[in-house]
Design a protein with these regions (language model features):
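Periplasmic/cell-envelope proteins involved in peptidoglycan metabolism and beta-lactam response
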Residues: 1-279
Length: 279
């Protein structure tokens, strides 16, 4: 009996050895092929994390230029088309909450059924997207709303509209300074985008890696918003008073004014007329 157990033990051991050898050979000869098959069954998740451009402030902290978070409304047709009820539920929710055309969405979906990125609206505020998010989170309606997500970005806003417009300058749509301080100090005000990425399998197991965005630095000027406001108001009053007096048009074609602190050379106000709205 003992001899039979010993023989059985060695047979099992040989079987495991043979199986191990077979696995080694499979990995050597077909490892890359199986690796590609596994990766093909996974979903790659990647998104950009936008940096926040630095603020421009006067000497007392009054904000002359800021960046506010906004959201792009993005449609993933491939995900929405997984079930017919998803298509109807999603389109109904979109047309209920946003100024989008049902016919345009259906037309795009028919022509691009596998599209995973289509921007329906840009630069929406949080208040504008909140009603839709409520529908998404609703236990009954939410399960039929699929393939819609919000892409975050920042929009440049100038709280005082025309104040120090020639000095502050403005940015282009891609968040790059194009004029004034925005352009001159663009490298300081700009940051570096981050990224979040990872692989997701069918069980929604995701090994996620996040590289955080680096925000831009704030820029503090020597301007005094109170003095700046007084200067601009006086320039406006002058031009309103003498408009169409000596000739047709403004009191002056162009007017400029600079207020300097004689003790240290700080520029407290710098204005020119006509004004323009930075927003």
């Amino acid at each position: 009996m003992q001899k039979k157990l010993v023989v059985l033990y060695f047979l099992v051991l040989l079987a495991f050895a043979g199986l191990s050898a077979r696995l080694v050979l499979i990995n050597r000869d077909n490892g890359e092929q199986y690796k590609r098959q596994v990766l093909s069954q996974q979903q790659y998740s990647s998104r950009t994390l936008p940096f926040k451009r630095g603020e421009i402030l006067d000497s007392k902290g009054t904000k002359l230029a800021v960046s506010e978070k906004v959201y792009n409304l993005v449609l993933d047709c491939k995900l929405m088309n997984e079930k017919e009820e998803y298509v109807e539920g999603t389109i109904a929710a979109l047309t209920q909450c946003f100024d989008v055309s049902e016919s345009d969405i259906r037309s795009y979906n028919e022509q691009n059924p596998t599209s995973q990125y289509h921007v329906l609206q840009r630069q929406l505020t949080y208040d504008e997207i909140a009603p839709f998010q409520e529908l998404q989170n609703n236990e009954e309606q939410g399960k039929y709303i699929q393939g819609v997500w919000f892409e975050e970005e920042y929009r440049r806003v100038y709280p005082n509209n025309t104040m120090a417009a020639d000095v502050v300058g403005f940015t282009s749509k891609d968040n790059v300074g194009n004029y004034g301080l925005e352009e001159y100090y663009n490298d300081i005000l700009s940051g570096i985008n981050g990224r979040e990425y990872g692989y997701m399998n069918d069980d929604s197991n995701l090994e996620r890696t996040t590289k955080a965005a680096v925000d831009g630095y704030n820029l503090v000027t020597t301007l005094d918003a109170n003095i700046q406001g007084i200067v601009e108001r006086k320039l406006q009053e002058y031009n309103d008073t003498y408009k169409n007096a000596a000739r047709e048009g403004n009191g002056a074609q162009n007017v400029g004014c600079i207020i300097m602190d004689v003790n240290n050379g700080d520029i407290l106000a710098m204005a020119s007329y006509p004004f323009f709205n930075l927003n």
